[in-house]
């Protein structure tokens, strides 16, 4: 599997680090920076599918101009950038047309409304559009993994997301990565499909633990919220750096989706967010109408809309207490890779 990954993603260095396709925030600058530093950067879905495709086109231009990717710039190569889709809201025809034109190296599929049927449909249409584009599918339960591995459209990579993750994860049936991953790995044994670990990983310690569980690579989301290239409000980013104790200060709730006017997510999913006054007051009995009015007012005050006294959505994972500052994506990757190698080396001396 390691040899296969190396041939598919020849610019990637070890350990294999991925920046997740965070909605809107994972723009072309972050994706190109991550891939340019030896990882694999994904562009996140936009407000509509066309937005993601515009980002992918911008990333393609940046890659062609970059000396880092000069050896990959032939007409036969795929774009060293991935793109993510939320299947319940994205348009597969628009996505397939753009993938055919721009040939990203990977397409990350997540959150189908109709389960495996939607995943199969998207996988087939993307493969027809661009046979070289690898299909990455995110799952968060053993049941999803079982359905996926019985499919006629097997993915090229499975991303196993633990319940510690930020953004939208399983609403009620999620499980921590350290228990979920080995069970999925046992199920997938013999399939030769690489498994990537996601959820709660923000430094070399988490990455090393995931590799010891058998992961071929690791995915970080919350850590990259504090990358300088991330498309994010300064107030939001400052709150990610400030917050600690993810067990106490984050929760899964649909409140912030609804305050922002986002409805329609499949019922299996619910986002994790840093708690602030909106959630606290909801729990105390404040009506949604009043919370909505206060939320909309907070949108007008800039960076002060975030923080413990703020009211705006701050989607982030339980690992938020491990994020201590804003750095360039390249520095984050180097730091995590070096720490992982050091920790793995130390562990090998103790067994």
Name every feature range the model reports, one short phrase each:
Residues 2-191:
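Active-site entrance/lid segments in N-terminal catalytic domains of soluble metabolic enzymes
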């Amino acid at each position: 599997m390691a040899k296969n990954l190396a041939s598919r993603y020849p610019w990637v260095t070890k350990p294999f680090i991925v920046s997740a396709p965070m909605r809107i925030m994972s723009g072309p600058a972050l994706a190109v920076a991550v891939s340019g530093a030896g990882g694999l950067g994904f562009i996140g879905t936009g407000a509509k599918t066309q937005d993601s495709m515009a980002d992918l086109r911008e990333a393609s231009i940046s890659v062609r101009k970059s000396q880092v990717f000069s050896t990959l710039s032939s007409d036969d190569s795929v774009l060293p950038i991935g793109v993510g889709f939320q299947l319940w809201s994205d348009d597969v025809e628009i996505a397939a047309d753009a993938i055919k034109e721009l040939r990203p190296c990977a397409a990350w599929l997540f959150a189908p409304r109709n389960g495996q049927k939607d995943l199969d449909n998207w996988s087939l249409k993307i493969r027809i559009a661009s046979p070289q584009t690898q299909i990455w599918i995110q799952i968060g339960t053993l049941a999803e993994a079982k359905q996926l591995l019985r499919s006629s459209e097997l993915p090229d990579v499975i991303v196993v997301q633990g319940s510690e993750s930020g953004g939208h994860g399983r609403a009620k049936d999620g499980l921590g990565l350290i228990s979920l991953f080995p069970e999925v790995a046992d199920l997938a044994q013999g399939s030769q499909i690489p498994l990537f670990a996601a959820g709660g990983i923000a430094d070399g310690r988490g990455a090393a633990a995931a590799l010891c569980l058998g992961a071929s690579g690791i995915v970080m989301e919350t850590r990259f919220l504090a990358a300088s290239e991330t498309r994010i409000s300064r107030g939001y980013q400052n709150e990610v750096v400030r917050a600690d104790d993810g067990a106490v200060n984050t929760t899964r709730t649909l409140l912030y989706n609804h305050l922002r006017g986002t409805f329609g997510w499949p019922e299996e999913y619910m986002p994790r967010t840093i708690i602030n006054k909106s959630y606290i007051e909801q729990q105390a009995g404040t009506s949604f109408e009043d919370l909505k009015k206060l939320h909309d007012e907070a949108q007008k005050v800039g960076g002060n809309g975030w923080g413990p006294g703020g009211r705006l959505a701050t989607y982030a994972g339980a690992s938020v207490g491990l994020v201590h500052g804003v750095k360039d994506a390249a520095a984050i990757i180097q730091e995590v890779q070096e720490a992982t190698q050091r920790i793995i080396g130390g562990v090998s001396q103790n067994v």
